[in-house]
C-alpha cells in the first residue's frame, strides 16, 4: 500500500500540468469512450461525460486512472429532441441533455477494427441482428400508428417460425398428424427450429415428468378440499 501511495505522489510531482488536490473516493460518474468518426484523426478522443464535468476533471481523470496525457479538451452539450414520455403516448418532454468532450491526446490512439462476421458468431451475433431488426420494424410501425394510420398485417414480414407453424397447422387440419395433449409441444423439433441457430433436437411426444404430474394432481386436490 505504501508503494502505491509513493508511486501516486511521484506521478503528481512529475505531472506536466497542475492537477487538482481534491480526492474523490468511490465516484458514481459514468464516462463513455466513443468510437471516432471515419475521418477523425487518431489524436482526438471523444467521451460522453456527466453534465457537471468540466475540462479539468476529464484531463485529471485520464492522467490519474490511465496515465494518458492530454494537451487540450473541447466540450459541447447536445440538446435532445422532444419526445413523448412513453413511446407514442404520454406527455411531451425534452430528455436530459448530453455532454461530450473531445480530448487532444499527446500520444495518438487507433481504435481496433471491428471483428469480422465469422468472429462475431461466437457472441450470438445472429440473434442480436434479429432482435435489432425486429425492434427497428416495431419502432417504424409505432410511428405510423401514432399518426393515426392503420398498419395492415400484409406489411409485416413473415418469419420462418410463422411459416413453420402454418405448415404444421395445415397438417393438423388435414389429419396427417394429431395433437397429443399432455405431451411436449410438437413445435419444438428439429424440423421447426433450424440446427444452425444453436438449438438441439427435442424428441416428439416425450411424456412429462411423473413428479411434475403428481405435484399438479396434489395441488388440484388440495384446492378442491379448500373449496369444500
Curated annotation (Swiss-Prot):
InterPro entries: Nucleotide-bd_a/b_plait_sf, Ribosomal_uL23-like, Ribosomal_uL23/eL15/eS24_sf
Statement: the UniProt record of this protein carries the keyword Cell membrane: no
Biological process annotations from GO: mitochondrial translation
Short name of any one Pfam family annotated for the protein: Ribosomal_L23
Assigned GO CC terms: mitochondrial large ribosomal subunit
Composition bias type Acidic residues, residue spans: 195-216
GO molecular function terms attached to this record: structural constituent of ribosome
Keywords: Mitochondrion, Ribonucleoprotein, Ribosomal protein
Subcellular location: Mitochondrion
Keyword Ribosomal protein tagged: yes
Superkingdom of this protein's organism: Eukaryota
Transmembrane spans: none
Positions of disulphide bridges: none
Region (Disordered): 194-228
Coiled coil (residue ranges): none
Quaternary data: Component of the mitochondrial large ribosomal subunit (mt-LSU). Mature N.crassa 74S mitochondrial ribosomes consist of a small (37S) and a large (54S) subunit. The 37S small subunit contains a 16S ribosomal RNA (16S mt-rRNA) and 32 different proteins. The 54S large subunit contains a 23S rRNA (23S mt-rRNA) and 42 different proteins. uL23m forms the wall of the exit tunnel.
Family: Belongs to the universal ribosomal protein uL23 family.
Functional description taken from the UniProt entry: Component of the mitochondrial ribosome (mitoribosome), a dedicated translation machinery responsible for the synthesis of mitochondrial genome-encoded proteins, including at least some of the essential transmembrane subunits of the mitochondrial respiratory chain. The mitoribosomes are attached to the mitochondrial inner membrane and translation products are cotranslationally integrated into the membrane.
Protein name as it appears in the record: Large ribosomal subunit protein uL23m
Source organism of the structure: Neurospora crassa (strain ATCC 24698 / 74-OR23-1A / CBS 708.71 / DSM 1257 / FGSC 987)
Gene name, Swiss-Prot/TrEMBL: mrp20
